[in-house]
Amino acid sequence: MIIKTLKMSARKRN
């Protein structure tokens, strides 16, 4: 799933 990676990246960036 691409959404899972995007959410993970967003959480790390936050």
Curated annotation (Swiss-Prot):
Induction: Expressed in both exponential and stationary phase; expression is considerably higher during stationary phase (at protein level).
Name of the protein in its database record: Protein YacM
